[in-house]
Regions:
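An alpha-helical interface "stripe"
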Residues: 1-175
Length: 175
């Protein structure tokens, strides 16, 4: 059996690069190896927010918030998923909400100092209709999934094309 796989050739290099930049590896099921000790990470099933990381960051950024404020913010984000606004309400929560902060964007230094960064592989994402998918790599800030990366072996044109079509279908928005 070859010591090289799709994981070792295309998934691990960007994952290791993100970890070298300060991203903390997290796992939905938990993972303990010679190199990684990741406890099981809880996530909100509707938003895929990593609840423990989100709550910790929320109270760091909003120290005078009430005890249930982080949970209320997750509920607010859940409700915003029903909007056909292309994520505008969520954008406003991150960038324009001056009362409660969920990500510190006040300056580049504060961004790195006051936020936490996580990365996961093969994290199941989906919606209430059961449309689930597992991106190769998901990137989080303060437990909030903000980006995902799909990786393919070089010269895998059929795989790249198939993934492109899946994304077009999955992320279509009403006109």
């Amino acid at each position: 059996m070859s010591s090289f796989s799709e994981d070792s050739r295309v998934k691990f290099p960007p994952l290791m690069h993100l970890m070298s930049m300060g991203y903390n590896y997290v796992s939905q099921k938990g993972l303990k190896t010679k190199y990684v000790n990741a406890l099981e990470t809880k996530s909100d099933p509707l938003t895929n927010i990593l609840t423990d990381y989100f709550t910790e960051a929320y109270f760091k950024l909003n120290p005078s918030a009430e005890l249930d404020a982080a949970e209320k913010m997750i509920n607010k984000i859940q409700k915003s998923l029903n909007n056909d606004d292309l994520g505008r309400q969520f954008y406003n929560e991150i960038f324009l909400n001056t009362g409660e902060r969920i990500i510190d964007l006040s300056s580049p230094n504060n961004f790195y100092r006051n936020n936490t960064f996580q990365v996961a592989t093969e994290m199941t994402c989906g919606n209430k209709d059961g449309d689930n998918f597992r991106p190769d790599i998901t990137i989080f800030v303060n437990g909030i999934p903000l980006a995902f990366i799909e990786v393919k072996k070089e010269n895998n044109h059929k795989g790249i094309q198939a993934e492109t079509e899946r994304m077009k279908t999955r992320f279509t928005t009403p006109a």
